[in-house]
Swiss-Prot record:
Expressed in flowers and pollen. The gene is PAT02. GO terms for molecular function: protein-cysteine S-palmitoyltransferase activity. This is Probable protein S-acyltransferase 2. It comes from the Eukaryota. It comes from Arabidopsis thaliana. Keywords: Acyltransferase, Cytoplasmic vesicle, Lipoprotein, Membrane, Palmitate, Phosphoprotein, Transferase, Transmembrane, Transmembrane helix. GO terms for cellular component: cytoplasmic vesicle membrane. It is a multi-pass membrane protein. The DHHC domain is required for palmitoyltransferase activity. Palmitoyl acyltransferase. PANTHER family: PROTEIN S-ACYLTRANSFERASE 2-RELATED, ZINC FINGER DHHC DOMAIN CONTAINING PROTEIN.
Length: 411
């Protein structure tokens, strides 16, 4: 007897299937992050939205430093080669350090706080005193207090609710309107580095502005020394014969007042354990500072304490978002059949109610194109009240209000 040959027909994927698979490729968190940050090297480098300002900062530092180094190279061949070689080496070292601290400040996660998808419920909040000012969350179903009071080192500190990130900001945290993130121990957003200055990059920022001040003073002093050494001590002859050193001296004299003043101001903030935001807003120099620990402990906390790891790993794979229809059905079932706090995930089959009849019924329910919705219900043994949430044609149960958020569509 001849054997029948079984032939399998393999259909080539259509363009719609290809586009669907491309759209549903897994993505990393940095690719879906709702903030305004710029990510490079696969999410390893986190810049602010105004990172282009780094070009101006680099030019303002590198231009004078490079000019000074080139001038020193010409002086090495004329007289005192060892002396000018040491000056050149010191200038190169300070310039490299300055750019290193600039890069570490601008490309580092400053301490971004993860966002919530839903606002906390007002009745579940543990607070000392409740604010009289209330705010609607994004769902518009409940109201929560805009502020709450917590204890920090024996002091009562008021923390605010962030309408964008849907969370109560931790103490000393604030929402940066430029980066659109809540940031830990927020100091300020620096336009010169194009990044928020906060918990995880503040030590590098201090090193950056301190090194910039030292570089300005270094170029200023040794430009004078080299100029007087080469051209003598007559000021008029010096100015007319070496305009390069004159321009460097004037430039560094102007810049050092700004960057040097900024360095002194932040050294004061470090000694008193304040941030720029707190200094301008709360004026802790005129009242008790709940974060002050004394001079030496404040210095130790900044320069020697371990920098905490980031709260978000932007290179992690982003969790797949459930379908909106499935999510609305699950939430409605949870509110109707399950006790408060019990949750069931229809896709992952996990939750606090693993043996729930609703979960088992949803798991075993299948749609049959050849049978009607009523036949499917009878076949699978699903009650009409349960089936009304996800099967068209079944009458809506009486205990569900008409303004339900469920969106049931015909399959």
């Amino acid at each position: 007897m001849g054997r029948k040959k079984s032939c399998h027909v393999h259909n080539a994927p259509s363009d719609d299937d290809i586009m669907f698979s491309q759209d549903h490729k897994p993505k990393r968190i940095y690719q879906l992050w709702p903030g305004n940050n710029r990510f490079y090297c696969g999410g390893r480098l986190v810049f602010g939205p105004d990172a282009s300002s780094l070009l101006l900062t680099t030019a303002m530092i590198g231009g004078p430093a490079l000019t000074f180094c080139i001038r020193m190279v010409f002086l090495i061949g004329k007289r005192y080669p060892l002396f000018h070689s040491l000056i050149l080496l010191g200038a190169l070292l300070l310039t490299v350090l300055d750019f290193t601290f600039l890069f570490l400040t601008s490309s580092r996660d400053p301490g971004i706080i993860p966002r919530n998808k839903e606002a906390p419920e007002a009745e579940g909040l543990d607070m000392i005193t409740q604010s009289s000012e209330w705010v609607n969350n994004k769902l518009g179903n409940t109201k929560i207090p805009r502020t709450k009071d917590i204890l920090v080192n024996g002091y009562t500190v008021k923390v605010k609710f962030c309408d964008t990130c849907l969370l109560y900001r931790p103490p000393r945290a604030s929402h940066c309107s430029i980066c659109n993130n809540c940031v830990q121990r927020f100091d300020h957003h620096c336009p010169w580095v194009g990044q928020c200055i906060a918990l995880r990059n503040y030590p590098y920022f201090i090193c950056f502005i301190s090194t910039s001040t030292l570089l300005c003073l270094y170029v200023f002093v040794f430009s004078w020394v080299s100029m007087l050494e080469v051209h003598g001590k007559m000021l008029l002859m010096v100015i007319t014969n070496d305009l390069v050193f004159v321009v460097l001296i004037l430039y560094c004299f102007v810049v050092v007042w700004f960057v040097g003043g900024l360095t002194v101001f932040h050294l004061y903030l470090i000694c008193t354990n304040q941030t720029t935001y707190e200094n301008f807003r709360y004026r802790y120099d005129k009242k008790e500072n709940p974060y002050g620990k004394g001079l030496f402990k404040n210095l130790y906390e900044l320069f020697f304490a371990r920098i905490p790891p980031p709260m978000i790993n932007f290179r992690d794979w982003a969790p797949e978002e459930p379908d909106e229809e499935v999510g609305s059905i699950a939430s409605e079932l949870d509110r109707t059949f399950g006790p408060r706090g019990d949750k069931y995930d229809m896709e992952m089959e996990i939750g606090g109610c693993k043996n729930s009849k609703v979960g088992l019924q949803l798991h075993t329910l299948e749609y049959d194109n050849n049978n009607s919705s009523e036949e499917t219900v009878k076949k699978k043994g699903v009650s009409e009240e349960t089936a009304a949430f996800y099967i068209p044609g079944i009458q809506e149960p009486a205990n569900i209000t008409r303004n339900s958020s469920i969106d049931v569509r015909s399959r």
